[in-house]
């Protein structure tokens, strides 16, 4: 006798179909590349797909200056990485709020140094032009241009791989999370680093629904139940909200996470957490105030692709098709940092 309610049955059937589809996809994939964006940006290579990132606007008008990498010693206290795709309408107010906050913190403490890296993910509007003009007024802002639209995951990955900060915050360009929530994540990560320098703090909306602090639509709440089941299948445990675009990494954690990240679009967050938990990093959730922005980029088709990606993460890591590089194979030992 089936005691499950109709909705639970529907979710179970969808998950089962996705599992079969992804398994067949993995089975039929004769070659699954273990290369990541890191292999095309940091490692020396003659591959024609090699990507070179230069700071924009250039600090030197006569030459292009390459972005530093996360494997160099930190130069500032914190880096805010902002992935941006067609954000011409929202990037200015977001930068206004963020710069005001960071300047206030810096005025209170001279050791609070910062940078913002806006990663333009192949925008078709004038996002890059807006950020460039903003950066002329605020030299702590750097524009990193992707050669084409590669996905939010790739944008975050590129920004974090080229950060100078001791702490690296991933933050969405839509302003859904108030920027001063950074302080809550900052406090938590400092407590975690007394145990392990490799640490992540995840901004979370899941803890706040009872307190009505998170204003989420019923549709997203329903879809969240199904995704939570898939996230568990993918191998993420103990994290209730993997998808909030507000996460803080130590530099030491970033050096392991982003060279090993394969997923380049919406579903990269769970993969980072799978990598972190395989490395036994310290991972914690902190409630943040969050408001859903009406002009959401996530469409139904994107949600389906994300669900397939989650099952793909589970299969590829378990089958050894994707791996977390051992220390001897990573740039950490090569750079001797």
Swiss-Prot record:
Keywords: Endoplasmic reticulum, Glycosyltransferase, Membrane, Signal-anchor, Transferase, Transmembrane, Transmembrane helix. Its EC number is 2.4.1.117. Its main location: endoplasmic reticulum. Residues 1-6 are lumenal. GO terms for biological process: protein N-linked glycosylation. It is an enzyme of class 2 (transferase). One of its GO terms (cellular component) is endoplasmic reticulum membrane. InterPro entries: DPG_synthase, Glyco_trans_2-like, Nucleotide-diphossugar_trans. GO terms for molecular function: dolichyl-phosphate beta-glucosyltransferase activity. It comes from the Eukaryota. Pathway: Protein modification; protein glycosylation. It catalyses: a di-trans,poly-cis-dolichyl phosphate + UDP-alpha-D-glucose = a di-trans,poly-cis-dolichyl beta-D-glucosyl phosphate + UDP. CDD domains: DPG_synthase. Residues 28-337 are cytoplasmic. It is a single-pass membrane protein. It is found in: Endoplasmic reticulum membrane. Dolichyl-phosphate beta-glucosyltransferase involved in the glycosylation of glycoproteins through the synthesis of dolichyl beta-D-glucosyl phosphate which serves as a sugar donor for transfer of three glucose residues to the Man-9-GlcNAc-2-PP-dolichol precursor to N-glycans. Belongs to the glycosyltransferase 2 family. This is Dolichyl-phosphate beta-glucosyltransferase ALG5C.
């Amino acid at each position: 006798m089936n005691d499950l309610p109709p909705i639970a049955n529907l979710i179970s059937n969808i998950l089962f179909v996705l599992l079969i589809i992804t398994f067949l996809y993995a089975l039929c994939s004769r070659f699954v590349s273990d290369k990541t964006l890191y292999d095309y940006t940091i490692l020396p290579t003659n591959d024609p797909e090699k990507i070179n990132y230069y700071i924009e606007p250039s600090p030197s008008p006569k030459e292009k200056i390459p972005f530093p990498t996360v494997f160099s010693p930190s130069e500032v206290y914190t880096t805010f990485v902002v992935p941006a795709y067609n954000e011409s309408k929202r990037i200015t107010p977001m930068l206004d709020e963020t710069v005001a906050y960071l300047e206030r913190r810096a005025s209170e403490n001279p050791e609070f140094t910062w940078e913002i890296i806006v990663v333009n993910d192949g925008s078709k509007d004038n996002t890059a032009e807006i950020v460039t003009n903003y950066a002329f007024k605020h030299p702590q802002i750097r524009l990193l241009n992707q050669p084409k639209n590669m996905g939010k995951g790739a944008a975050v990955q590129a920004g974090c791989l080229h950060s100078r900060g001791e702490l690296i915050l991933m933050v969405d360009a839509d302003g859904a999370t108030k920027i001063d929530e950074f302080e809550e994540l900052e406090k938590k990560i400092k407590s975690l680093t007394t145990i392990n320098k490799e640490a992540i703090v995840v901004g979370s909306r899941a803890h706040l629904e009872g307190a009505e602090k998170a204003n989420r639509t019923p549709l997203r709440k329903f879809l969240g139940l199904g995704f939570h089941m898939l996230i568990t299948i993918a191998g993420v445990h103990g994290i209730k909200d993997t998808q909030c675009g507000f996460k803080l990494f130590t530099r030491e954690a970033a050096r392991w996470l982003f060279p090993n990240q394969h997923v380049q679009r919406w579903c990269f967050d769970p993969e980072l957490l799978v990598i972190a938990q395989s490395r036994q990093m310290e991972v914690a959730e902190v409630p943040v105030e969050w408001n859903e922005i009406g002009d959401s980029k996530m469409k139904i088709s994107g949600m389906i692709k994300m669900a397939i990606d989650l099952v793909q993460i589970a299969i590829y890591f378990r089958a050894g098709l994707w791996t977390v590089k051992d220390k001897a194979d990573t740039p950490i030992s090569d750079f001797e940092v």
